[in-house]
Each structure stands twice: as C-alpha cells, then as structure tokens.
C-alpha cells in the first residue's frame, strides 16, 4: 500500500500542476468564470489531499496494514478522484450532472479524515503491539 499511495500522491501532484497551468493559461479566456472556479476548486482539493496520502503512506511504514490506515488511504485516493474528477468534468464539459457526483467524493474524503483520526487515536496502541482503549 505504501508504494501505491506514494505513486498516487505523485500522480495527483503531476495532474494538479498540469490542470492548474492549463486552467490558468489555456482555459482562462475560453471558460465562463463559474466553470473556471470549479476547475480551481478541483485543483485545490487535489493539493489539499496529497499531504494526507503521504501521511497515510508514512503511517503504513510505521504500523503496517491497520484498518483505520487502510480505510484512510483508499478513501483519500478514491475521494480525490471522484471529487476533483467530477469537478474537472463539470468545468470542461459544462454538464451539470457531474456536479451530482461531487458529494460522493466529498463523503469519501470525510471518511478518509475520520479514519486518519482513528489511526491517530490508536497509534500508540499499535506501536506497542497491543490494542488498548484510547484516551485512558
């Protein structure tokens, strides 16, 4: 999972820079302001979640394949794809139906953050090899 998340974070960074530049230069004069705003939001959310993917990859090297960390990694990976991908499609095509898909990606991102919270709460227990009740 570590290698996969590192690759995804790198691909998302590559795509984010490319889309940001494409939007700022090639599309600025061609798209209405609302659609440009959708593209900018998509790029922003890609970049917000690259550090999260890297953090989960780092956690994976420390504690291995624990449930919260696995859920966080895949939720972030899919959430970025669905959330930002639907906004990019909305921006490029103008098809409003893509906007209906965006909340699904948002929920996946929220699940990822919640799972990362769970991984942080249980982190001390995992590192000692015994799961204990957190915050006790």
Locate each region found by the language model:
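Polytopic transmembrane helical bundles with strong interfacial aromatic enrichment
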Residues: 1-136
């Amino acid at each position: 999972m570590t290698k996969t998340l590192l690759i995804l974070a790198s691909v998302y960074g590559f795509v984010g820079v490319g889309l940001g530049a494409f939007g700022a230069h090639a599309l600025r004069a061609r798209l209405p302001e609302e659609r440009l705003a959708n593209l900018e939001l998509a790029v922003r959310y890609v970049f917000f979640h690259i550090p999260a993917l890297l953090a989960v990859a780092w956690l994976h090297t420390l504690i291995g394949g624990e449930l919260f960390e696995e859920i966080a990694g895949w939720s972030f990976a899919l959430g970025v794809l669905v959330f930002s991908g639907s906004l990019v499609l909305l921006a490029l095509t103008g098809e409003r139906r893509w906007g209906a898909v965006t909340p699904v990606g948002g929920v996946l991102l929220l699940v990822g953050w919640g799972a990362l919270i769970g991984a942080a709460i249980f982190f001390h227990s995992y590192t000692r090899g015994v799961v204990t009740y957190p915050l006790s």
